[in-house]
Each structure stands twice: as C-alpha cells, then as structure tokens.
Amino acid sequence: MTTGRAPTRTGPWPYAAWALTRAWLLACVFKVVTVAGPDVTVDVSVIYRSWYEVLLTGTYPLDDVTWQYPPGAALAVLSPALLPFWEYATAFFVLVLVCDALVLGLLLYAGRRPGMRAAGAWVWVVGVPLLGPTVYARYDLMVTAVAVAALLAGVRRPRALGVLTAFGALLKGWPVLLLVGVRKGLPTRAAWTSAALCAAGLAAAFALWMPGAFAFLAFQRDRGTEIESLGALVFHIARQFGWEGRVELRYGSMEFVGPRVELVSTLALGLAVLALGCCCGDCGPASSPCAPRPRRRSRRCCCSR
C-alpha cells in the first residue's frame, strides 16, 4: 500500500513472530504437539506420496479420481525429491516452510520501498498460523508464493505478472484471477498476452512430458459440493433443521450427499461464472497492481515548442 511516506523499519519483530508461529506449525505436522481433530498430515504421507510414486513411473495418475489438479501440480508433488535424504513427508513440510519464508521475504522487501509499509508482511505472519497445521499439509502455500511474486512483479512489469500467473494457474487454477485486476489498456494486453503464451507453452510441455496431463478434467465432472465451499454453507445450516443429507469422502474430498445437493452445486457454478464475468467487466484503473502513473499536465502553452 502506498502511503507517501518513508518506508517503515520493521526491525526483528516480524522475523521473531514468524519463527515462533512456524515452529508451532512444524511441531503440529511433525506430531510433537497434538491438535484436536483429524490427522491432516495423512494427505501428504499417504495421498501425495502415492501420487509421487505414480509420477516417478513417467505418467500422471490416470486411474485415480482423487487427482483433481492441473498438470503443474506434479512439480509440487515431486518437489520432495529435491531433498532425498529425508522421507517424503518431512521433505514436503520443509519445502513448504521455505516457500512460507520466501513470501515473508518478498513482502518485507516490498514494504521497504519508498512510500510503502510492512502491513502485508504482518498479515502474512499472523494470518497463516490461524489456518492451523492444514496450511503446511497442502501444497497451496507453494502456489501462494508464486501468486505473491506475480503481484509484486506486476507493479512495474505486467508481462512478468502474466508469466508467473500462468505458471501459478497450471499449479492450481486460482492464480489466473490475478489477471482480472490488471488495468485496462497496455498493461492488460501485456499481462494477458504473456499469460496466454506462457500457459500454452507450459501446457504443451506438460502434455509432452508425461501422458495424462489433462486427465483431471474428466475427474471433475462428478464432483459435488465440498464441505468447505461457500455453497456448502446452505447445507451446514440445513443440517441444524433436519436436512437428511450426509457427508462422504468422494473424489478425494469431503462432500455433501443428499437432497438438493446437485441443484446447489449447479447454482454455485453458475454464480461463480457470473461473478467472474462481473469482475472482468468492472476491473478499472484503480484496481491494477501495475497501473502506470498518470502524467502531469504541462503548464507550458499548448502552442509553444
């Protein structure tokens, strides 16, 4: 956020708070500290590990309906191979920690620029541990690191924003929404063009790399309403008033099954498309992270040379 003042000196406090909170997260995922609820690390030690073994054979998980991710997700799942001296889950948690630290570094670096402040870094330091140990037991934080890098790069380089956004979208889809906020005009054309070209190139590379790069698209069609989705709020409330549905593990996620679930899923999908259309239509000059500064009007006479 631009404030028009000198950059704030943060001192050691963000680093200290980050170290303490991340030590707690690591203690949770390594089971030094017991947290109430299901064991979220199973997703890494069992599901991710099984995908890892399949990917090492030179193919995407063609027969596993729990594989619901774009082809770039293979890079995240295979990343623990960078640390072969540790077991899979340990290496994964350490790499997530590294990505967490990278985001903090990027936000603190951005906060040191003239006219900026470190509020974003503090939100990151405090907000991530509030998500609990689940945040270290998913590869979403790796995707977030790419998205944050894209936003910060886009302040001056919309093409860099486009390239990083395309890479992030092939990891887990949602970073493509960053393109919605780019200012109309030259920044939009630069960001969207670079994103399209990069996405096409990467998609082709993944398709040539291993068979089944886009098999996940067929696995998506039968998915229902996941319990953590916004549409599921209807059923969370309905259960308190006698709704006869239930929760089941289907297609790799906990979903609601029962009366009206298909209707709500269809409505949620339609509303999501409508919301995306509204965002694309309403993105304006004030919404851009890479909008050029307006030029000052010259005071000289319009006919002077």
Task: Name each model feature, range by range.
Residues 134-143:
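Short acidic/glycine- and proline-prone juxtamembrane loop motifs at membrane-interface regions
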Residues 3-4, 176-210:
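Perimembrane helix-loop-helix junctions
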Residues 2-117, 131, 220-228, 232, ...:
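TM-lumen/periplasm interface segments of multi-pass membrane proteins
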Residues 92-108, 125-128, 144-147, 270-277:
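Transmembrane alpha-helical segments of multi-pass membrane glycosylation machinery
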Residues 107-128, 288-296:
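Transmembrane-helix signature of polytopic, membrane-embedded enzymes
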